[in-house]
């Protein structure tokens, strides 16, 4: 199997994950806010919350509009509660 992408953030639906980013971030833009919510906290920490299944990204900009971070977010269900239905 492929090695996990270190730039991809995996989070479960209705769960939150803390991610440390470089300082100087002024603005966060989320590709699809129906899939994930990204909230900037003090100290360059963002809270990534899974809202719907799928993949999106977020871009962090500094005050001049320069892109500091562009990361993929994968929102999935908890694998320990996965049910397979055979028809």
Regions found by a protein language model. Name each.
Residues 1-87:
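Sec-dependent N-terminal signal peptides of Gram-negative outer-membrane/periplasmic proteins
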């Amino acid at each position: 199997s492929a090695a996990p992408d270190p730039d991809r953030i995996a989070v479960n639906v209705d769960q939150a994950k803390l991610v440390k980013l470089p300082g100087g971030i002024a603005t966060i833009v989320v590709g699809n806010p129906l899939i994930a919510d990204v909230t900037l906290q003090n100290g360059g920490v963002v809270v990534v919350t899974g809202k719907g299944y799928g993949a999106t990204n977020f871009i962090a900009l500094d005050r001049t509009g320069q892109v500091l971070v562009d990361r993929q977010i994968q929102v999935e269900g908890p694998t320990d509660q996965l049910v397979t239905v055979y028809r």
